Each structure stands twice: as structure tokens, then as C-alpha cells.
Amino acid sequence: NDIMTRMFGYFLSWMQEKTSSVYVIATANNAHNLPLELKRKGRFDEIFCVNLPNEDERKKIFKIHIGNKKQNLDEAALNSVSLITEGFNGADIESLVNEAVEKCFIDSLDNKGTAFDERLLKDIASKTVSITKSCKKQIDNMKKAFKENNFKDATTGKITT
């Protein structure tokens, strides 16, 4: 902990005293735990929050993970599963796709022939506990911190309200 304190102090001094243009990009899973000295004006020009993906973003995430697994889903099915997965983050969606592919594979070994399709994804999604349900309190606290600190939404570029 002593080393972290010294490194943090050194980092803050460096940020304050640097003489050339430097871009510092940092991430944090919990803005509440960031030290006040790091959040004060002048340390970072912009602070963004990355919210849960909206419907269009979820659709893009589905396309990526479905493509990575060499599967296909038509546009209407993509729209449908993107709509019903509100509150899912990228990891939730990846897990959903992985589970569907795994089910298709296991069923193929048993000659059941389960198809990778909208119905299968919806069935798995209905049984999936998304991060917004399993970590509701923490997510609500993070959203509160976004508002209190006037963080900008990374998708829209607007102050979180």
C-alpha cells in the first residue's frame, strides 16, 4: 500500500508538471473509489462513463460474437434478440452466444440437431441473470456517481443525467 501511495503521488505530480502534450487514458470499474485528487478539474480534460449498451450497440455486439463463432443470424432475428436483452452487457451477450453454440454442439453429438437460431438465443436469454440484475445496487451506485461527477456518456458525449 505504501508503494501505491508513493506511485500515485508521483503520477499526480507528473500530470501537473509535464511540459509536453500527453494523452492519458485510464479506466476504472468503480468511479466511487477514485481518489478526489484524481477527479478534480485539470487532472483529466474529459471523464467519460461507459454505460450498458443500448439496443443498437447490443445488436453490434451480437454480430461480433456470432461472427466469431462462425454462426449466422438474419437481421430480423438480430433485432429481436437485441430488443429482449436490455440490461445485458457485452460479457452477458458473449456468454449467451457461447452457451448457444455449446448447446448446438452437444446436441449434435446426441443427434438432436438443435439449430443456432433466434428461438435458442431467446430461450437462453430468458434464463440468464444479467449483470444489471445480479449487481443492481453497484450499478445504481455507479450511475449515481456518473451524475454527481458530471461524467460524459461515452456513446452520446453528453453529460449523464
Regions found by a protein language model. Give the residues of each.
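Walker A/P-loop NTP-binding motif of AAA+ ATPase domains
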Residues: 1-82, 88, 100
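C-terminal engagement/docking regions of AAA+ P-loop ATPases
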Residues: 25, 80-95, 105-161
